[in-house]
Amino acid sequence: MINFPQHPRQTLELAGFLPEASGRAVEWLISDSQVPYSEAVAAMDSRAAAIAAGDANELVWLLEHPPLYTSGTSGQAADLLDPRFPLHATGRGGQLTYHGPGQRVAYVMLDLKRRRPDVRAYVAALEQWIIATLEAFNVRGERREDRVGVWVARPDKGVGHEDKIAAIGVRLKRWVSLHGIAINVEPDLGHFAAIVPCGISDPRYGVTSLVDLGLPVTMTDVDLALRASFTTIFGATVNASGSEPAAGSVNSSSV
């Protein structure tokens, strides 16, 4: 069992996630077409095992899924209000969420043994990565102690209203991270209405996207910002070969 330090994520020192001096750059891969969820998880698990064994480089894999819902280890069946899309049980932390076109999913496979074996600080580092990415578009993303993910204030909706713009869910195997983050660029936000997102039913807390906030942002814009902000927290990246990680079955590119 992993023991979590009992201190706020805002106060965690995020230094220490850069790799060892002798470490290789993180491979960076972008899939051009939608990737079925089961295929992505199988490829991610395989790559993580290879990283743990020292047989593969760390990897960040950016992709989009076809419409689906995933349930984390704390997911509740009652939170699926309308099963309009397939539901996948997954080993990541958290509850129910939606994935689909227009949402940038980043699966992050890092060896925390050679960085910093601290799960809570790693989640905070992922949040900071998202916050720094949003800053490139003049969007103020914020973390909340009682709600993992990144939020934006919505005073236009009323006092105390906030919308979630990015979700985080992680799992570790032999201190190699799996799963990662999902940023809403231009998904169909109506699909979130079929679930209680992340188990949060308070009507003050909704879901938004960059386009919903009025920004003419493309997926390529977000990918470039993600890569630039990633290097400041986790270190250098290098373009991955097009055949990884899904055994040649996924069309891919690097930017």
From Swiss-Prot:
The active site is at C198. Signal peptide: none annotated. It catalyses: octanoyl-[ACP] + L-lysyl-[protein] = N(6)-octanoyl-L-lysyl-[protein] + holo-[ACP] + H(+). Residues 54-238 form the BPL/LPL catalytic domain. InterPro entries: aa-tRNA-synth_II/BPL/LPL, BPL_LPL_catalytic, Octanoyltransferase, Octanoyltransferase_CS. The record marks K164 as: Lowers pKa of active site Cys. It is found in: Cytoplasm. It is an enzyme of class 2 (transferase). Substrate binds at R92, G93, G94, Q95, L96, T97, Y98, H99, A167, I168, G169, G180, I181, A182. Coiled coil: none annotated. GO terms for cellular component: cytoplasm. Pathway: Protein modification; protein lipoylation via endogenous pathway; protein N(6)-(lipoyl)lysine from octanoyl-[acyl-carrier-protein]: step 1/2. Keywords: Acyltransferase, Cytoplasm, Transferase. Its EC number is 2.3.1.181. The keyword Oxidoreductase does not apply. Its main location: cytoplasm. Pfam families: LplA-B_cat. HAMAP family: LipB (MF_00013). Catalyzes the transfer of endogenously produced octanoic acid from octanoyl-acyl-carrier-protein onto the lipoyl domains of lipoate-dependent enzymes. Lipoyl-ACP can also act as a substrate although octanoyl-ACP is likely to be the physiological substrate. PANTHER family: LIPOYLTRANSFERASE 2, MITOCHONDRIAL-RELATED (PTHR10993:SF7), OCTANOYLTRANSFERASE (PTHR10993). In the reaction, the free carboxyl group of octanoic acid is attached via an amide linkage to the epsilon-amino group of a specific lysine residue of lipoyl domains of lipoate-dependent enzymes. This is Octanoyltransferase.
